[in-house]
Amino acid sequence: MWIQVRTMDGRDTRRIDSLSKLTKVDDLRDRIQQLFGVALESQRLFYRGKQMENGHTLFDYSVGLNDIVQLLVRQIPDSFPTKHKECELSDASAGCGSGQRDSDSGSGEGAMDVDGQSISIIGENVGTSLYKKNDLVDARDLNMGAWFEAQIVNVSKKVGPYGTLPEVSDTSVTSDAIIYHVKYEDYPENGVVQLTCKDVRLRARTTLPWHEIKVGQVVMVNYNPDEPKERGYWYDAEILRKHESKKIKEIYAKVLLGDAGDSLNDCRIRFVNEIYKIEEPGSTYLNTESPQKRQNGPECKHCKDNPKRACRMCACCICGGKQDPEKQLLCDECDLAFHIYCLKPPLSVIPQDEDWYCPDCRNDASEVVLAGEKLKESKKKARMASANSSSQRDWGKGMACVGRSRECTIVPSNHYGPIPGVPVGTLWKFRVQVSESGVHRPHVAGIHGRSNDGSYSLVLAGGYEDDVDNGNEFTYTGSGGRDLSGNKRTAEQSCDQKLSNMNRALALNCSAPINDKEGSIAKDWRAGKPVRVVRNSKGRKHSKYAPEEGNRYDGIYKVVKYWPEKGKSGFLVWRYLLRRDDYEPAPWSKEGKERIKKLGLTMQYPDGYLETLASKEREKENKTEDEPIDSPSKGKRKRNSDNEQTAAKSIPKKMKVASYKLTLEQKTLIKQDVLNAKLWSEVMLFLKEGPKFVNKVEETFLCICCQEVVYEPVTTECHHNICKGCLDRSFKALVHSCPACRHDLGKNYPLNVNKPLQAILSQLFPGYESGR
């Protein structure tokens, strides 16, 4: 097993070989120290967001083959001299740095720092301040640009960090230097907000009649940018045009969204009888007795702020009651309210914690692994046979234990028949690669299937000594009858086999009624369910049809018959006769060998495997060169040039791959898919690369939501292909934009399926739509 270690900045990546699943993190740190030269105490290792700690193994962190572990070099702080620290302490005690405290203490009623500038609170009036303490004003919300009714609670002036405070009577203080501390009347939870003069003005109190509203006039109107037909908040607006008929009055205006210059053009104002005049600065101050309050849009769209109506959105989400607001808790994650007596279990008092989370959002603190902590015990791994075994054998070096690095999603796991893009004759070095391709999913088991459905694939490996393999037809012995307790992979036959589990699954593929006593023979064997067959090099000792190395996909077979009999071990076993039924030629035939050459099918290795072998060979060569020669040899030593020539000969030449051939119907469907013409022009360039064409189609037409080949594709106006089901779920969540580029599609966007694209994908990936 090997992994890659990459520095956090991504500049240096090294491969570490000869590892095991049971390798300790402590040992991994030693290997990293040898490669990177980073001290042990300076290493911080991360894998999938977890910090790896000593005492655990790679298996505990589920580190897979060729996975990347990130290395962060811990910076050790420099130690300051003791004299320097004593000097700092003595300076502080002697009054060094006390100028800031003096200035703070001499800043009147109090001082604070905002945006790097000092604000000194003076009191009720500051120089040329337009408004005084307790004045009723309109204050602008800096995020929305809307105006809300507020009251001034204090006034201050702003000076630089090193400036001196002018006198209160100094008239040179400009309005921009005045800070108003206001409190919104309807939103006391926001506290006191500091605003400048441009965001504060006198409370609007004059409604304009229809005849006084002029085109070009700037007034204050009620508008809802999200729902224009509903009541919203109060914005400044410039009148664009007005129209009056016998039944209706219409006003269109440009709504101004704040001081930044943003605006909404040609907006229809619904509430034409509630248009306010903007008060000029310097007008008569309002008294504390406010005029009639303006009406804003409801905070809750569900209950329209009706106090008598129960609502689980703006009130307690359990009972919906609006009583006892002082006994409600607001979840800091989902923002839903809860009565303390509605919780399970109920609370007697409001908790004093700064943050509170509801039962659905709260994380179990006992399951959270903090940085520097050991991993929690996994119940799943504790039940494994390896956890209870007393054997000291290192089982973690085998390729069957590394786990899949990818998974086949083109077709579901219960797919019958060939896998799209995997031709007959494909070779893999290890069984885990066969699992990743989807041809045979189990890593170790010989039969893949379900006892109530059938068998999807099987592997011919070592098998039984009395199995017969004739290539196009072979006998196969079922599974079971062996004691595989603990972590054993194989054992001698010790009891009779039963027609259950995988044996029954393989029997269901036979086109005959199931019979668990005598077996059955198919009248029409071709009508049975197809089984994908993979031959392993371990079967070479029994069969000449097995590959010399690795695993080979040999095509589709059908079960002709199955029957029970006593094997050489003396116990009852179930035997199956399978016969080849595939239009692709067998890989051992003359036609099959020519097809393999045309398609350029060669042995497939895991990522990093060849590099690992090369590094091991270099290590062996270095060791042999470093070994002292005890006695002179009569033979001549080979020159490096000879070694290089032999190495060059061992590298296979790149074969010319046969082009992928499309049928006439497929070419017609591609031409009909006009919306994806640009994508198809790029994909068609891969026709000359044979089987890679199918992989390119899969990569190009991948749904960005489900990360699988699009099913019932909807080609958007921005030329992205999304599954109809995925886009429909997005629309139900009120997200009406393209998932790929966020282009606004609108609420009423039609979800029309691209039928030519669906047809061509169904032909290139037969069976991929099952289970979607």
Swiss-Prot record:
Record keyword Phosphoprotein present: no
Zinc-finger ranges (PHD-type): 297-364
Site location (Required for affinity and specificity for 5-mCpG sequence): 489
Record's GO cellular component terms: chromatin; euchromatin; heterochromatin; nucleus; replication fork
SUPFAM superfamilies named in the record: FYVE/PHD zinc finger (SSF57903), PUA domain-like (SSF88697), RING/U-box (SSF57850), Ubiquitin-like (SSF54236)
Residue spans of biased composition, Basic and acidic residues class: 615-626
Top-level EC class: transferase
Chain positions covered by the region annotation Disordered: 90-111, 615-649
Keywords from the UniProt entry: Cell cycle, Chromatin regulator, DNA-binding, Metal-binding, Nucleus, Repeat, Repressor, Transcription, Transcription regulation, Transferase, Ubl conjugation pathway, Zinc, Zinc-finger
Residues flagged as site, Histone H3K4me0 binding: 314
Zn finger intervals (RING-type): 703-742
Region (Tudor-like 1): 129-205
Any Gene Ontology biological process: protein ubiquitination
Main location: nucleus
Site positions for Required to confer preferential recognition of cytosine over thymine: 477
All residue ranges annotated as the YDG domain in the record: 417-580
Region named Required to promote base flipping: 443-444
Domain Ubiquitin-like, residue spans: 1-77
EC number: 2.3.2.27
Region of interest (Required for formation of a 5-methylcytosine-binding pocket), residue spans: 464-467, 476-479
Protein name, UniProt field: E3 ubiquitin-protein ligase UHRF1
Organism: Xenopus laevis
